Amino acid sequence: PITYYMYPIISNECLGMIFALPGKGKTLFALELAWRCSQGLDFMDWKFNNMIKPPPVLYVEGEMSATQVQDRVSSMVERDRGLKDFDLDNFYIAVLKEQPNESYQKLKTPEGRLNVQNSADEIYKKTGKKPIIFLDNVRFLMGNFNEKEGQDWIDFVLWLATLRAKGYSTYFLHHAVNTGEKASGSGYQDSNLDVNIKLSQPDENSATDHSSDHFTQIQFEFKKMRENVIGQMTPFIMVVDRNKGSWSKFPVLNKTERKIKSMLDSGKSAKDIINPEKEGMSKANVHKTINKLKGENDGVDKKTSNREAKEVC
């Protein structure tokens, strides 16, 4: 049976892709998700399933050094200190740059794929739990391959399907095409996914008022999910405080809708806000915004909220 670690973003036997343009938050988000899952911590509105023990994580990194990854993990440890006892042995890192001459076998080769699978099997033998595998990112870890050719993806995609059949969950990170609308490649890499996540930078009209000097904004969108849950398919904005390392969630609103939300948050009623003389404050627009905000809070699947071993946010 499928068991969710964090409903609905990650479960056992899950194959997921996170794609974005370079520098738009793939590693920042994936490391945070991996860390919190390995320690049984909630992540924004995604609640960790406290009916099960946290799974180990194997994070395979193709760009950063082990020191850079460990520095990021250390900052998360410091931030979360006091929330619960940590199990740092539940978070494993394999880094391309730490191999002699960066000679880590590429995932395009059978040897490279076997290396990762053997590492995952060793963690399973040691802990008794199958790790979640993160591959960051495909372009660097695969090596010399033509991502626009479906033929070049076949062995990799079949290997991911084999891992899933063995009970392993795998998330791989990938770059987007220049428009940012879809993952780069032939489309074959999307064919077997349970979860497909698009990350992007919010456009100027929908970005929040947080200063770009101190905060990073990432727009999150599920492009595909194993289960279509009401409210979960709605895009939202994640705001990361770079000093504190904290993550906050905001609805995607234009500037007028954000102004209406601010007035509602201050205690004003719809009747107080409606003003046909003011641009954007018509009765129709105010109620449209209220309904949009209400939809942000309706992401609970009533049918699945009582299922065993599933926490629904």
Residue ranges and their predicted role:
Residues 49-53, 123-127, 162-166, 190-191:
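Conserved catalytic network of the ASCE P-loop NTPase/AAA+ motor domain
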Residues 126-129, 165, 205-313:
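C-terminal regions of RecA-like/P-loop NTPase motor modules
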Residues 51-146:
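Conserved inter-motif catalytic segment of the P-loop NTP-binding fold
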Residues 1-78, 83:
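The Walker A/P-loop phosphate-binding site
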Residues 10, 59, 136, 193, ...:
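Conserved RecA-like P-loop NTPase ATPase core
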Residues 17-18, 23, 28, 151-243:
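Phosphate-binding/switch region of NTP-binding enzymes
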Residues 36-40, 76, 141-144, 163, ...:
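Conserved, well-folded catalytic cores of nucleic-acid-processing
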Residues 3, 66, 70, 110-117, ...:
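Amphipathic alpha-helical transducer elements in NTP-driven molecular machines
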